[in-house]
């Protein structure tokens, strides 16, 4: 959002000239401005501060184009926008002269022992919605910069919400280097941090580009559950669990569901195995990102499967990142997790989803989960649903689930004979 913040009250006509003359249009000393920025940003709680010019992010644009052409953006239309737009800060603000990149840790600690019957949540989503939290801090920071530097500042402030290659800008600003998992890695903080930006119409002394290397380490590539990391720094979103459970609005491909495991929202595997995170991950000092401020590290699957209305969903998850996939998307995810965990206590809730939920997406994935869990109650519900289901996609899932449940029952019978 483009905004102007005036720390002064509206002046009377007689004082306009005095206040206007007190505010310059230009920063006098870019180096001093950089020092002031560092001081103010760190006081706001940002652990990483960097600056780069507002020119095109050429290298990042080239990589993005190759990724787009390979079809790896999946259904994320916003990532298929023209590279010329995504790689140029001045397309967002014509008067731009500097891009300030800031990093704030969201690392809440290690995942606790698996909650029985729980679906895992990626760490960035344990607390409050970072868009809402960081946006307000950026507003305050811009206003404080204007007051401290004594000049009017035209700025655009955002975090993960505008068409710009934010990680490329942050790398140019010295915040880190690109790891093989495509995450931006800071050698002193790891990769568990949010990136926030201020595009300013003022010249601020820039920082050197971020440097670093993964060396010979390929742990993220070899441990990705779905093999989504196709080459160093290249992630195929069509296979990525984070995409499949968050941005994806359709079904999770049947052939990938078992690889999703117990992840109900996002995935941290490629970050969990990273040596930089094992040694350097910095615990967040922002209380808004703590587990107690939001959904936490696990979702009780049977409870989530019982959410039937958007109003109930919003009441429970409003103000957190978990609203992103919507009610149907989150129940889809929890159904898959229930199936992978063979969660027998979830059978009644899954049967209810299959019989009563208004979303074909939920009914179809609930059917798959029942097929994975098996048992007489699951099989009976699937057979009854096969006679009533009107949606073709859901009916296909039910038929597949019946076959799976039947095979599972045959296996049990053979083992017992």
Role assignments for model-derived ranges:
Residues 293-332, 336:
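Glycine-rich phosphate/pyrophosphate-binding loop
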């Amino acid at each position: 959002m483009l905004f102007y913040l005036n720390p002064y009250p509206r002046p009377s006509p007689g004082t306009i000239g005095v206040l206007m003359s007190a505010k310059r249009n230009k920063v006098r000393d870019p180096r001093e401005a950089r020092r002031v920025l560092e001081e103010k940003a760190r006081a706001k709680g940002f652990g990483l501060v960097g600056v780069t010019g507002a020119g095109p992010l050429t290298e990042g644009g080239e990589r993005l184009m190759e990724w787009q052409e390979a079809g790896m953006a999946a259904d994320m239309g916003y990532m298929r926008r023209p590279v010329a737009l995504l790689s140029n800060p001045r397309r967002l603000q014509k008067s731009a002269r500097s891009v300030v990149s800031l990093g704030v840790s969201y690392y809440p600690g290690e995942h606790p022992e698996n909650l029985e019957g729980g679906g895992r949540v990626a760490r960035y989503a344990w607390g409050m919605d970072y868009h809402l939290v960081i946006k307000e801090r950026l507003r305050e920071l811009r206003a404080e910069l204007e007051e401290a530097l004594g000049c009017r500042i035209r700025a655009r402030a955002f975090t993960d919400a505008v068409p710009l290659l934010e990680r490329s800008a942050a790398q140019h600003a010295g915040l880190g280097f690109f790891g093989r998992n495509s995450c931006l890695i800071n050698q002193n903080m790891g990769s568990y941090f949010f990136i926030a930006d201020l595009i300013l119409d003022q010249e601020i002394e820039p920082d050197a580009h971020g440097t670093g290397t993964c060396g010979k380490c390929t742990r993220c590539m070899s441990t990705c559950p779905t093999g989504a990391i196709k080459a160093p720094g290249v992630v195929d979103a069509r296979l990525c669990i984070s995409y499949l459970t968050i941005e994806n609005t359709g079904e999770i491909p049947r052939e990938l569901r078992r690889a999703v495991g117990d992840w109900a929202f996002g995935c941290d595997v490629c970050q969990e195995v990273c040596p930089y995170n094992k040694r350097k991950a910095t615990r967040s000092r922002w209380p808004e990102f703590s587990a107690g401020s939001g959904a936490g590290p696990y979702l009780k699957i049977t409870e989530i499967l019982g959410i039937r209305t958007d109003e109930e969903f919003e009441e429970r998850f409003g103000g957190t990142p978990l609203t992103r996939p919507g009610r149907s998307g989150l129940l889809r995810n929890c159904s898959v997790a229930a199936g992978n965990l063979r969660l027998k206590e979830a059978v009644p809730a899954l049967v209810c989803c299959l019989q009563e939920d208004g979303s074909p997406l939920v009914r179809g994935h609930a059917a798959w989960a029942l097929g994975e869990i098996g048992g007489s109650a699951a099989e009976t519900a699937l057979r009854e649903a096969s006679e009533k289901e009107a949606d073709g996609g859901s009916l296909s899932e039910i038929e597949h689930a019946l076959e799976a449940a039947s095979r599972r029952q045959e296996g049990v019978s053979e083992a017992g004979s």
